[in-house]
Amino acid sequence: MKNLLYVVLLMAVCILGLLIVGTIFYLFLEVFMYFYVNAPISLESFQFTRLLKMSIYGGGILGLGIGLLRIFKIKGF
């Protein structure tokens, strides 16, 4: 039971981390495009929903993989 809680907590941390990194990257990319290409800043909702889906799936898989490797005591984790 303790191992399952560990995996779920690790998945949540990975999801949140990827969401924060992805949001910062997306905002910096919009600012870069505004200053260097003179493209208008367009913060569209479908971009954020796509970013949320990517962070949930990617962070979930990453957290699950790291958690399982740690539970099975694979070297390096």
From Swiss-Prot:
Gene that encodes it: cdiI
Chain's role: Immunity protein component of a toxin-immunity protein module, which functions as a cellular contact-dependent growth inhibition (CDI) system. CDI modules allow bacteria to communicate with and inhibit the growth of closely related neighboring bacteria in a contact-dependent fashion. Protects cells against the CDI activity of CdiA, its cognate toxin protein, but not against non-cognate CdiA from E.coli strains 563, EC93 or D.dadantii strain 3937.
Assembly behavior: Probably interacts with cognate toxin CdiA.
TM annotation in the entry: 8-28, 54-74
Taxonomic source organism: Yersinia pestis
Keywords: Membrane, Transmembrane, Transmembrane helix
Compartments, as annotated in UniProt: Membrane
Keyword Magnesium: no
Keyword Transmembrane recorded: yes
Membrane topology according to the record: Multi-pass membrane protein
GO CC, alphabetical: membrane
Protein name as catalogued: Immunity protein CdiI
